[in-house]
Each structure stands twice: as structure tokens, then as C-alpha cells.
Swiss-Prot record:
Cofactor: Mg(2+)
Species this chain originates from: Endomicrobium trichonymphae
Protein name, entry field: Crossover junction endodeoxyribonuclease RuvC
Keyword terms, alphabetized: Cytoplasm, DNA damage, DNA recombination, DNA repair, DNA-binding, Endonuclease, Hydrolase, Magnesium, Metal-binding, Nuclease
Subcellular location: Cytoplasm
Catalytic activity, as annotated: Endonucleolytic cleavage at a junction such as a reciprocal single-stranded crossover between two homologous DNA duplexes (Holliday junction)
Annotated gene: ruvC
Chief location category: cytoplasm
Record-linked InterPro entries: RNaseH-like_sf (IPR012337), RNaseH_sf (IPR036397), X-over_junc_endoDNase_Mg_BS (IPR020563), X-over_junc_endoDNase_RuvC (IPR002176)
């Protein structure tokens, strides 16, 4: 199953594509960031995100996408910008008939480390190790997008007899410790 993870941001939208064969066998296909300049009008920035994300979709043909949920910022302007960016991303996925799953930051951290308070560096190390990458993905938004894709892998009900026929389900947006593998303990101790 090919999964597109997205970390939405108006200036930098991170994306990561992984191919999952099982919970433990996940290969990174590619990752990167879509950058827009603050000096460009909002509509053009959203169009850039749409166009570049469409190119990623056309190239990798993801079966599902996962995106970070909007969480509350202190700055109202940031909330609006990320909300508008998410709208452009959700529309792009919808027009391509790609099911889109949303995860809050704490759920992503819990899925990868076993606890929801992991710091950014711990998350980046887990992504690097789990996906067998030579270095931590840069910029941070790309690493976050890969983490969101790997988080989605943990919500897949893998049929032991036929991994090609994996069915997807969403677990109440909060992962139960017993319902997922703890990648942090499995890979290394931090």
C-alpha cells in the first residue's frame, strides 16, 4: 500500500511517500517540501501547493493519504494560514479520490514512540531508523510528513493471509497502547 503523509504549512508543506507491505516492512519512496514565499499572494501560494502536491500524486499514485490535524496555535493568523493550506490539500486529495485520514500530533508521537510527549529530535531519529534512511530527513517538515505516513501504517488492519488486501480503519483518533507496536522500544532506546 502506498501512503502519502502530509505536514501542512503555508510556507513549507512537508510530504513523504512510503510503501507499506506490513506493519514492520515499510519502505520510503521519496520525501520533500513544497515551499511558498510570503511575498506571493495567498491564492498563488495555495495554487502552488495544489500543483506540486498533484505532481507528487501523479508520480507515486498513493492509495491513501494522511495529514496532521489542525491544532491550536497562539497566533490566530497561523491558524488561518494552516487551515487554508489544509483546505487546499484536502481538496487535492478529494479530487483524486484518495481517502484522507487525519491524526493529531500527539497520536503521531504515540504511534511512533509509545508516548505522546516525544520531542522533535526523538521523532526524527525514529523516522530515520524505522525507514532505514542514511540521515534524518530535512527539512523538519519532510520528517514530520514521513512520521504521519508511518503513523497511518499503524492504523491498518493487515490481513495475515494477504498483505495486498489490507483494509484500513481509523481508531478514534487516539491510539490505545495495546493496539499498536511501540516502534521506540522495538528499534532502540532513547
Amino acid at each position: 500500500m502506498i501512503i502519502l503523509g502530509i505536514d501542512p504549512g503555508l510556507s513549507l508543506t512537508g510530504w513523504g511517500v512510503v510503501e507499506a507491505f506490513s506493519r514492520d516492512k515499510v519502505n520510503p519512496l521519496q520525501y520533500g517540501c513544497i515551499k511558498t514565499m510570503p511575498s506571493v499572494p495567498l491564492i498563488q501560494r495555495l495554487q502552488t501547493i495544489n500543483t506540486k502536491l498533484q505532481s507528487v500524486i501523479d508520480k507515486y499514485k498513493p492509495e491513501v493519504a494522511s495529514i496532521e490535524e489542525l491544532f491550536f496555535f497562539k497566533a490566530t493568523k497561523s491558524i488561518a494560514a494552516v487551515g487554508q493550506t489544509r483546505g487546499a490539500i484536502i481538496l487535492t486529495a478529494s479530487l483524486n479520490k484518495i481517502p484522507l485520514f487525519e491524526y493529531n500530533p500527539k497520536s503521531v508521537k504515540t504511534a511512533l514512540t509509545g508516548y505522546g510527549s516525544a520531542d522533535k529530535y526523538q521523532m526524527q531519529r525514529i523516522v530515520k531508523t524505522f525507514l532505514r534512511l542514511k540521515e534524518i530527513p530535512k527539512p523538519d517538515d519532510a520528517a514530520d510528513a514521513l512520521a504521519i505516513a508511518v503513523c497511518h501504517v499503524n492504523t491498518i488492519n493487515w490481513n495475515a493471509n494477504n498483505n495486498n488486501n489490507a483494509s484500513v480503519f481509523l481508531k478514534n483518533k487516539v491510539f490505545k497502547e495495546s493496539a499498536k507496536p511501540n516502534l521506540l522500544k522495538k528499534l532502540f532506546s532513547l
